Protein backbone atom coordinates (compact mmCIF):
# COMPACT_ATOMS: atom_id res chain seq x y z
CA UNK A 1 0.00 0.00 0.00
CA UNK A 2 1.10 3.54 -0.71
CA UNK A 3 0.80 6.51 1.61
CA UNK A 4 -1.27 9.20 -0.07
CA UNK A 5 -2.05 12.74 1.03
CA UNK A 6 -5.15 14.43 -0.41
CA UNK A 7 -5.92 18.10 0.05
CA UNK A 8 -9.55 19.15 0.31
CA UNK A 9 -11.29 22.51 0.37
CA UNK A 10 -14.67 24.21 0.02
CA UNK A 11 -15.85 27.82 -0.14
CA UNK A 12 -19.48 27.49 -1.27
CA UNK A 13 -22.57 26.66 0.76
CA UNK A 14 -22.17 24.65 3.95
CA UNK A 15 -18.39 24.34 3.75
CA UNK A 16 -18.11 22.10 6.82
CA UNK A 17 -20.70 19.70 5.42
CA UNK A 18 -19.02 19.51 2.00
CA UNK A 19 -15.62 18.84 3.63
CA UNK A 20 -17.14 16.27 5.98
CA UNK A 21 -18.92 14.48 3.15
CA UNK A 22 -15.74 14.41 1.04
CA UNK A 23 -13.68 12.97 3.91
CA UNK A 24 -16.40 10.42 4.63
CA UNK A 25 -16.38 9.30 0.98
CA UNK A 26 -12.58 9.11 1.00
CA UNK A 27 -12.70 6.99 4.17
CA UNK A 28 -14.94 4.49 2.36
CA UNK A 29 -12.70 3.96 -0.69
CA UNK A 30 -12.06 0.29 -1.45
CA UNK A 31 -8.51 -1.02 -1.01
CA UNK A 32 -7.79 1.99 1.21
CA UNK A 33 -7.52 2.87 4.87
CA UNK A 34 -7.94 6.31 6.43
CA UNK A 35 -4.83 7.12 8.47
CA UNK A 36 -5.48 10.68 9.56
CA UNK A 37 -7.45 13.86 9.02
CA UNK A 38 -6.06 17.29 9.80
CA UNK A 39 -7.86 20.05 11.60
CA UNK A 40 -9.81 22.45 9.37
CA UNK A 41 -8.23 25.76 8.41
CA UNK A 42 -9.99 28.84 7.10
CA UNK A 43 -8.06 30.43 4.26
CA UNK A 44 -8.55 33.34 1.92
CA UNK A 45 -8.88 32.46 -1.78
CA UNK A 46 -5.58 32.31 -3.67
CA UNK A 47 -5.87 33.71 -7.20
CA UNK A 48 -4.68 36.65 -9.24
CA UNK A 49 -8.18 38.11 -9.51
CA UNK A 50 -10.15 37.57 -6.29
CA UNK A 51 -13.86 38.31 -6.36
CA UNK A 52 -14.70 40.28 -3.17
CA UNK A 53 -17.89 38.21 -2.88
CA UNK A 54 -15.97 34.94 -2.92
CA UNK A 55 -15.99 33.21 0.44
CA UNK A 56 -13.00 31.95 2.35
CA UNK A 57 -12.10 28.29 1.97
CA UNK A 58 -12.10 25.60 4.57
CA UNK A 59 -9.07 23.44 3.89
CA UNK A 60 -7.60 20.28 5.29
CA UNK A 61 -5.60 17.20 4.38
CA UNK A 62 -6.41 13.49 4.54
CA UNK A 63 -3.81 10.75 4.81
CA UNK A 64 -4.71 7.36 3.29
CA UNK A 65 -3.03 4.05 2.70
CA UNK A 66 -4.23 2.73 -0.65
CA UNK A 67 -3.67 0.26 -3.46
CA UNK A 68 -5.63 2.40 -5.93
CA UNK A 69 -3.40 3.54 -8.81
CA UNK A 70 -2.71 7.28 -9.12
CA UNK A 71 -4.77 7.66 -12.32
CA UNK A 72 -7.70 5.70 -10.83
CA UNK A 73 -7.47 7.74 -7.63
CA UNK A 74 -7.65 10.96 -9.67
CA UNK A 75 -10.76 9.65 -11.45
CA UNK A 76 -12.30 8.71 -8.11
CA UNK A 77 -11.61 12.18 -6.69
CA UNK A 78 -13.28 13.74 -9.73
CA UNK A 79 -16.30 11.47 -9.21
CA UNK A 80 -16.52 12.60 -5.58
CA UNK A 81 -16.32 16.24 -6.71
CA UNK A 82 -19.17 15.66 -9.16
CA UNK A 83 -21.23 13.85 -6.50
CA UNK A 84 -20.81 16.93 -4.28
CA UNK A 85 -21.99 19.29 -7.06
CA UNK A 86 -18.60 20.63 -8.10
CA UNK A 87 -18.94 22.82 -11.21
CA UNK A 88 -16.54 21.07 -13.61
CA UNK A 89 -16.26 24.18 -15.80
CA UNK A 90 -15.06 26.31 -12.88
CA UNK A 91 -11.55 25.04 -12.09
CA UNK A 92 -10.30 28.11 -10.24
CA UNK A 93 -13.28 29.94 -8.74
CA UNK A 94 -15.74 29.22 -5.95
CA UNK A 95 -16.47 25.53 -5.48
CA UNK A 96 -18.39 23.15 -3.27
CA UNK A 97 -15.37 20.86 -2.98
CA UNK A 98 -11.88 20.65 -4.39
CA UNK A 99 -9.82 17.46 -4.02
CA UNK A 100 -6.15 17.28 -4.98
CA UNK A 101 -3.60 14.48 -4.76
CA UNK A 102 -0.69 16.12 -2.94
CA UNK A 103 1.63 13.12 -2.64
CA UNK A 104 1.33 9.51 -3.77
CA UNK A 105 4.09 7.76 -1.86
CA UNK A 106 7.43 8.93 -3.20
CA UNK A 107 6.21 8.78 -6.80
CA UNK A 108 6.89 11.60 -9.23
CA UNK A 109 4.35 11.62 -12.05
CA UNK A 110 4.08 14.14 -14.89
CA UNK A 111 1.36 13.09 -17.30
CA UNK A 112 -1.37 15.06 -19.05
CA UNK A 113 -3.92 15.90 -16.36
CA UNK A 114 -1.90 14.33 -13.52
CA UNK A 115 1.06 15.89 -11.71
CA UNK A 116 2.32 14.31 -8.48
CA UNK A 117 3.50 15.75 -6.18
CA UNK A 118 1.09 18.64 -6.59
CA UNK A 119 3.16 21.27 -8.43
CA UNK A 120 2.29 24.20 -6.15
CA UNK A 121 1.90 22.57 -2.74
CA UNK A 122 5.28 23.82 -1.52
CA UNK A 123 4.07 27.41 -2.06
CA UNK A 124 0.77 27.11 -0.21
CA UNK A 125 0.49 27.39 3.55
CA UNK A 126 -3.16 26.28 3.42
CA UNK A 127 -1.87 22.85 2.30
CA UNK A 128 1.38 22.77 4.26
CA UNK A 129 -0.13 23.66 7.65
CA UNK A 130 -2.62 20.76 7.77
CA UNK A 131 -0.09 18.42 6.15
CA UNK A 132 2.41 19.41 8.84
CA UNK A 133 -0.03 18.09 11.48
CA UNK A 134 -0.19 14.71 9.82
CA UNK A 135 3.47 14.14 8.96
CA UNK A 136 5.92 17.05 9.39
CA UNK A 137 8.83 14.78 8.46
CA UNK A 138 7.36 13.67 5.11
CA UNK A 139 9.97 14.51 2.47
CA UNK A 140 9.02 16.04 -0.87
CA UNK A 141 10.50 13.62 -3.45
CA UNK A 142 11.87 16.29 -5.81
CA UNK A 143 12.62 19.19 -3.46
CA UNK A 144 14.21 16.92 -0.83
CA UNK A 145 12.78 18.97 2.03
CA UNK A 146 10.40 17.89 4.77
CA UNK A 147 6.91 19.35 5.02
CA UNK A 148 8.06 21.26 8.13
CA UNK A 149 10.96 22.76 6.15
CA UNK A 150 8.68 23.66 3.24
CA UNK A 151 6.24 25.35 5.63
CA UNK A 152 9.04 27.41 7.18
CA UNK A 153 10.26 28.47 3.73
CA UNK A 154 6.82 29.19 2.20
CA UNK A 155 6.44 32.79 1.05
CA UNK A 156 2.65 32.57 0.81
CA UNK A 157 1.28 35.69 2.54
CA UNK A 158 -2.40 34.70 2.45
CA UNK A 159 -4.18 34.40 5.77
CA UNK A 160 -4.56 30.87 7.13
CA UNK A 161 -6.27 30.44 10.48
CA UNK A 162 -7.46 27.44 12.43
CA UNK A 163 -11.24 27.09 12.32
CA UNK A 164 -12.67 27.48 15.80
CA UNK A 165 -14.54 25.67 17.07
CA UNK A 166 -13.69 22.54 15.12
CA UNK A 167 -16.84 20.68 14.01
CA UNK A 168 -17.72 17.18 15.07
CA UNK A 169 -17.73 14.79 12.13
CA UNK A 170 -19.16 11.55 10.83
CA UNK A 171 -15.84 10.00 9.92
CA UNK A 172 -15.01 8.29 13.17
CA UNK A 173 -15.58 11.42 15.28
CA UNK A 174 -12.01 12.46 14.58
CA UNK A 175 -12.07 16.11 13.53
CA UNK A 176 -8.35 16.43 14.09
CA UNK A 177 -5.34 14.51 13.04
CA UNK A 178 -4.99 11.49 15.21
CA UNK A 179 -3.41 8.10 15.36
CA UNK A 180 -5.06 5.45 13.26
CA UNK A 181 -7.41 3.14 15.12
CA UNK A 182 -5.61 0.39 17.06
CA UNK A 183 -2.28 2.22 16.82
Range-by-range predicted roles:
Residues 11, 37, 130:
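Residue-level signal for inorganic ion chemistry
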Residues 21, 26-69:
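Short, surface-exposed acidic-centric catalytic microdomains
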Residues 18-19, 143:
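Residues at alpha-helix caps and immediate loop-helix transition turns in enzyme cores, especially N-
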Residues 1-6:
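Extreme N-terminal starter segment of soluble prokaryotic enzymes
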Residues 8-12, 46-48:
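A short secondary-structure junction motif
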Residues 46-57, 68-74, 79-183:
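Flexible, gly/pro- and Lys/Arg-enriched active-site loops
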Residues 14-16:
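Short N-terminal binding/cap micro-motifs at the start of the first secondary-structure element
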Residues 7, 63-65, 104:
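Short hydrophobic/aromatic beta-strand micro-patches
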Amino acid sequence: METVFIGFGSNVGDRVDFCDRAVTLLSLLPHSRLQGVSLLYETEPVRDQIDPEEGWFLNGVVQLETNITPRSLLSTLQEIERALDRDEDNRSGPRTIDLDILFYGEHVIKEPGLAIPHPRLHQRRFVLMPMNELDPLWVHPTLNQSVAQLLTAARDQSQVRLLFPQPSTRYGSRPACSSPPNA
